[in-house]
Amino acid sequence: MDDKSMARGRKAFFTGFPIRHSRSPLIHGFWLKEQGIDGSYEAVEVKPEDFSSFAASLAANGFAGGNVTIPHKEAAYAAAESLDEAARAIGAVNTLWLENGRLCGGNTDAYGFAANLDASAPGWDKADRALVLGAGGASRAVVHALLSRGVCHVSVVNRTLSRAEELAAHFGARVYAHGWDEAQALVSNAGLIVNTTALGMSGHGEGQDFPIDLTCAPKEAVATDIVYVPLRTAFLNKAEKAGLKTVDGLGMLLHQAVPGFERWFGQRPQVTQALREHILADMAKAGAL
């Protein structure tokens, strides 16, 4: 029996609360059709107080696993009986699967971040120094990816310095905390600049100028934003005008979905231009470009 036959009828889920317009079902639906797999990926809205019972009943409800988003990532971390290395390092789970009856948890955000850069800016990990703007939950995955790929010095800048200090303390050596007032000076020797803040995204000052001058960045520097709505953020527009190589955040969303699909359906999908165009068409329809 081949892997596709074994995957027949398998179900995976996507859960959060509330479930906003997620493109994960579109991504996995595209792959299921492309691979010819008779499976499903469905959105299930679960209230925070119900998550533990939901996680405990995955097998009974016929699920092979699924994706978890806000506000359940920490609860999924606590519910998992086994964690992968990325989930342990980041402290949050976005992917669940069943293995020999045990609930396992992983985090694919760091993988997605690095794979996006690998595809769009090969050699990005040769940078000795990286500058991460923002110290929220998403920045943990970014920092883990940078450290895993050998970046020697990671500067994390945040308006609330204590948040950056907490993140630096979590990861230890090679990660340094700075206040936002230090960001400008740090740009000049950063080989990679990552925006994880909401500045310039829809509903957060979109159309406004990004408040850091990027013209002093090294000419070979790469600038990437984990935000993908809008696709071209104020940060990326400013980086492009400064002559930097830019990478948008949509690829991170697409690549982070790969490991989960393989876990649940037994086939490793590819992130292709056709998939990207499929998601961009949906974004355009929703006025999210």
Curated annotation (Swiss-Prot):
Pfam families: SDH_C, Shikimate_DH, Shikimate_dh_N. InterPro entries: Aminoacid_DH-like_N_sf (IPR046346), NAD(P)-bd_dom_sf (IPR036291), SDH_C (IPR041121), Shikimate_DH (IPR011342), Shikimate_DH-bd_N (IPR013708), Shikimate_DH_fam (IPR022893), Shikm_DH/Glu-tRNA_Rdtase (IPR006151). Shikimate binds at residues 22-24, 69, 94, 109, 228. It comes from the Bacteria. One of its GO terms (molecular function) is NADP binding. CDD domains: NAD_bind_Shikimate_DH. SUPFAM superfamilies: Aminoacid dehydrogenase-like, N-terminal domain, NAD(P)-binding Rossmann-fold domains. It catalyses: shikimate + NADP(+) = 3-dehydroshikimate + NADPH + H(+). NADP(+) binds at residues 85, 134-138, 158-163, 226, 249. GO terms for biological process: amino acid biosynthetic process; aromatic amino acid family biosynthetic process; chorismate biosynthetic process; shikimate metabolic process. It is an enzyme of class 1 (oxidoreductase). The active site is at 73 (proton acceptor). Pathway: Metabolic intermediate biosynthesis; chorismate biosynthesis; chorismate from D-erythrose 4-phosphate and phosphoenolpyruvate: step 4/7. Belongs to the shikimate dehydrogenase family. Homodimer. This is Shikimate dehydrogenase (NADP(+)). It comes from Brucella ovis (strain ATCC 25840 / 63/290 / NCTC 10512).
